[in-house]
């Protein structure tokens, strides 16, 4: 697979790990290997529009002080961002707006900027699955860096539609376990044990 991919596309470097490290740890490997000013994290279960990536690039040239840019989900019932406390909603004429956090299925990192302020891994590897993106966004906001949604860059998240029906129950059990652990760890890390146990 690796050899075929790299021989087909001359600008592609494929990194294979010996086991499933989880979303955060797996992405950390790629982020560290990247020598570019920007890094795009993109899950395999997304559908891009023709202009999705180009609109992110255009936005990155308009505002150079961002930490993360993200496209907007086309599923309005499940937004891929959390608004800041002082902002109740956004209007369609806002092509860029600051947010509290974004979902991890599509994020453009300003690597040149973040490498100067993130001393270790981008993603905390204690999270195997769930909330690793919220943790990163929380840490980024604590150092007064900005996260933006680019509303004319659109993306559809399928959300694990390719799950084998035979494994569905087992996968659901695993997901539930990881969600409970990640929520506990996130709350303990940012708000203390009392909130972690109460949530």
What does each of the following model-derived ranges do?
Residues 43-47:
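The conserved acidic donor/metal-binding loop of glycosyltransferases
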Residues 16-34:
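Glycine-rich, basic loop-to-helix element that forms the pyrophosphate-binding segment
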Residues 82-108, 112:
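Short, flexible, basic/aromatic active-site loop/helix in glycosyltransferases
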